[in-house]
Regions:
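A polyanion-binding, active-site-adjacent surface
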Residues: 10, 14, 18, 22, ...
Length: 251
């Protein structure tokens, strides 16, 4: 058995185990075996191997619509819905308070995030943590942090349209389940993906927008700030608007 065949078999076993666990939670205790048709040597020889299939994008579990982040993560599984799975180490789902009032959405995992399986843990992640803790007086556990795509793009390139299309239903479902009061979109790509706009981030940032009925504030990505520290003051202005809005929501 080749390495790729072994990987496929392992993935199949994991998927089957998850399916059986779902069925058990639904009360299913046995599955009737369908009648197996007899295959003649002729049909066996003429049968061509089935082409590789792309997994169907769905936010429905076997029990129906998913109702928690845990179920959503379980449905994503060892995702192979786009080519990003070929080079990733971990699916980087998201982290934080499932009932957060504030949600940060970035572009996609980088090298550190891919290795750890957690968003924003590298140098850019430390800067975001400083914004949350030192600037806003919150903790990472108070907010929720996710990305537009859940797997690292090669060489940290921008995700391609088909990759975004594969991940977008899961991000939308995350937002539906968390239902934050405010979303902070970090960086050009996240902003344009969420707002479906090609307007430059320099014109969008600092102004309130709406996504799925939720207030959205675009601002620069922490990685951009590492390269352009002079623009930190602009992000701070954006964050102060977010803090003011959060205070009015709590009033």
């Amino acid at each position: 058995m080749s390495t790729s065949e072994g990987d496929e078999l392992a993935t199949l076993v994991i998927s089957l185990r998850r399916h059986l666990q779902r069925q058990q939670r639904m009360g299913v205790r046995f599955v009737a075996r369908p009648e197996v048709a007899t295959m003649t040597p002729t049909t066996m020889e003429s049968k061509e191997p089935a082409p590789d299939k792309v997994e169907r994008v769905s936010t429905h579990s076997d029990r129906g619509e998913v109702s928690s982040l845990e179920e959503l993560r379980d449905d994503i599984g060892d995702c192979r819905r786009c080519k990003l799975h070929l080079g990733r180490t971990h699916v980087v789902f998201g982290i934080g308070n499932p009932n957060a009032k504030l949600m940060f959405v970035g572009e996609g995992p980088g090298r550190d995030e891919d290795l750890k399986g957690e968003p924003f843990v590298g140098r850019a992640g430390q800067l975001l943590t400083d914004i949350i803790t030192k600037g806003m007086g919150l903790t990472r556990e108070d907010v929720y942090i996710a990305n537009v795509v859940k797997c690292r793009p090669p060489e940290n390139r921008n995700p391609e349209p088909d990759e975004v299309a594969s991940c977008e239903p899961f991000l939308k479902k995350q937002i539906e389940l968390i239902r934050p009061k405010i979303i902070v979109a970090l960086g050009k790509f996240a902003v344009q993906a969420l707002l479906q706009s090609k307007v430059p981030i320099t014109r969008l940032r600092g102004n309130w927008h709406t996504y799925m009925g939720i207030k959205l504030m675009p601002t620069f990505h922490p990685a951009y700030l590492l390269r352009n520290p002079a623009d930190k003051k602009l992000v701070w202005e954006d964050i102060k608007k977010v803090m003011k809005e959060m205070q009015s929501e709590n009033a």
